[in-house]
């Protein structure tokens, strides 16, 4: 009996101790961030969630605009269109200057396909003059969002918006494209997600020389959410490419005479005039009532140099071979006619107002051949036959482009970068195979169709020790929980060496 009486305090102490430990564990778990990310391996879910989440890529303010009016605002974002319908979606915008405020309603239009959960949205409204602060408001809750003044001058009258590059290594295509564009009066605006470091350094020098403008294309992240959402990068069409192209359009809407939406491997050689501007003006002058041009993309192969020292534009053109395969094309637009765009064209601008340019076509150089004759195995996935070049590239243009390339190659800074550029493909065949398996095979080869959102975010990109990547990054912010849409955005974008070669 004495032993039993002494044991009671021990049991009580043990019970209290265990309760404290359990309480500590529960408190610790509750303080840890809870992930609201939902997964959809099939890429086909239409589940309706309590809130549609939106990632704002950019907001531009136009003190004046030919097509948007006075004190206009234009938003570009990726937004969940399945939780709430985004057809004719509107939202409240509050604009402030030092003395006044204006409440307005933004109207919107979307670009892209219905089977992707996140769709590109462009929204527009007009606000207070001399805008200083901007908010989006819903049901009494608001979030302040950053904005920029749109461009009113451009380096060239023709801006070529290059779709976002990731794990970029094909510097030969870049050198070919940038010098051709410069010869014909075009300026490349290039979006970068990730790129081999030496290639990035090469681009930076071209930017300093005035040939290109580099821009960030950021991976979408929701930094703090109280409601569930599907991972945006896995559920948007092709890295939100339509968002990048719409952003580029809105940047230069008041600055450029023409804006083209090309990939890095789409190169246009004007056929009848010495410059893009003259060629485009001529085509539209001959077609009254039209306001944009549609160029097909003809598949080509070329032999690429392995080093910058041996790169020769003359030899490259001599090696070009054409196919009979002309794929869905890309557009060149008068910016006042377009407010948003998809990858190939805008569904909000009638195809009847386009000119279908039969010749020339875009020279599409997706899969080059190495100088040693080695063919990229990915080429065998496409059953394409090549023959003699059937595009017009004038001899005087070839000489001028070659001279321009040689001038750049002789710059000391370029000479120092050249030896560190990749001499062979690594990421290209990996990415091409992944894209082929996830979409192109069943769309163009088996033709059984693809039910899921066209997306290859799940591509496994191995990291290299010999070639590191620069990746775009930023400060990420989430607004307060708002209904029906919660907004996320970034500030202070920068180039990072710490992320790697990823999408």
UniProtKB/Swiss-Prot annotation:
Keywords, ordered alphabetically: Glycosyltransferase, Membrane, Transferase, Transmembrane, Transmembrane helix
User: What top-level branch of life does the organism fall under?
Assistant: Eukaryota
Q: How does it sit in the membrane?
A: Single-pass membrane protein
Kindly list the GO CC terms recorded for this protein.
membrane
Q: What GO MF annotations does this protein's record show?
A: glycosyltransferase activity
Membrane-spanning parts: 7-27
* InterPro entries to which the protein is assigned, alphabetical: Glyco_transf_92 (IPR008166), GTase_92 (IPR052012)
Q: Is the Transmembrane helix keyword given for this protein? A: yes
Give the family per the record: Belongs to the glycosyltransferase 92 family.
Query: What name does the UniProt record give this protein?
Result: Glycosyltransferase family 92 protein ZK381.2
């Amino acid at each position: 009996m004495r032993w039993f009486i002494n044991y009671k305090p021990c049991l009580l102490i043990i019970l209290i101790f265990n309760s404290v430990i359990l309480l500590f564990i529960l408190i610790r778990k509750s303080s840890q961030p809870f992930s609201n990310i939902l997964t959809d391996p099939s890429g086909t879910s239409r589940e309706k969630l309590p809130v549609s989440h939106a990632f704002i890529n950019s907001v531009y303010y136009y003190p004046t605009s030919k097509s948007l009016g006075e004190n206009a605002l234009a938003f570009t974002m990726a937004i969940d269109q399945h939780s709430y319908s985004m057809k004719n979606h509107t939202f409240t915008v509050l604009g402030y200057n030092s003395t006044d405020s204006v409440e307005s309603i933004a109207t919107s239009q979307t670009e892209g396909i219905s089977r992707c959960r996140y769709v590109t949205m462009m929204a527009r409204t007009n606000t207070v003059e001399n805008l200083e602060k901007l908010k989006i408001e819903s049901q009494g809750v608001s979030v302040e969002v950053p904005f920029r003044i749109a461009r009113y001058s451009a380096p060239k009258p023709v801006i070529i918006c290059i779709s976002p590059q990731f794990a970029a290594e094909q510097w030969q295509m870049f050198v070919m494209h940038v010098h051709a564009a410069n010869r014909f009066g075009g300026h490349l605006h290039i979006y970068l997600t990730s790129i081999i470091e030496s290639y990035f350094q090469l681009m930076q020098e071209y930017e300093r020389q005035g040939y290109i403008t580099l821009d960030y294309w950021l991976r979408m992240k929701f930094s703090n959410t109280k409601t569930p959402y599907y991972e945006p990068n896995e559920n948007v069409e092709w890295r939100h490419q339509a968002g990048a192209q719409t952003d580029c359009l809105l940047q230069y809407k008041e600055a450029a005479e023409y804006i083209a939406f090309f990939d890095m491997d789409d190169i246009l050689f004007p056929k009848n005039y010495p410059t893009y501007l003259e060629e485009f003006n001529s085509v539209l002058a001959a077609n009254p009532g039209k306001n944009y041009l549609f160029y097909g993309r003809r598949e080509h192969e070329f032999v690429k140099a392995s080093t910058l020292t041996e790169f020769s534009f003359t030899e490259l053109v001599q090696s070009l071979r054409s196919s009979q395969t002309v794929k869905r094309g890309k557009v060149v637009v008068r910016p006042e006619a377009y407010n948003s765009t998809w990858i190939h064209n805008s569904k909000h601008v009638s195809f009847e107002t386009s000119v279908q340019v039969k010749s020339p076509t875009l020279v599409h150089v997706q899969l080059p051949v190495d100088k040693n004759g080695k063919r990229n195995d990915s080429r065998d996935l496409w059953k394409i036959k090549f023959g003699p070049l059937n595009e017009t590239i004038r001899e005087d243009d070839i000489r001028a482009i070659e001279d321009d390339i040689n001038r750049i190659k002789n710059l000391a800074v370029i000479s120092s970068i050249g030896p560190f550029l990749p001499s062979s493909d690594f990421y290209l065949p990996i990415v091409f195979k992944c894209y082929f398996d996830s979409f192109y095979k069943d769309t163009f080869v088996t033709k059984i169709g693809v039910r899921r959102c066209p997306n290859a975010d799940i591509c496994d990109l191995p990291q290299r020790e010999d070639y590191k990547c620069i990746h775009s990054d930023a400060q990420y912010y989430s607004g307060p929980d708002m209904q029906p849409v919660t907004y996320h955005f970034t500030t202070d974008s920068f180039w990072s060496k710490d992320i790697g070669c990823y999408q």
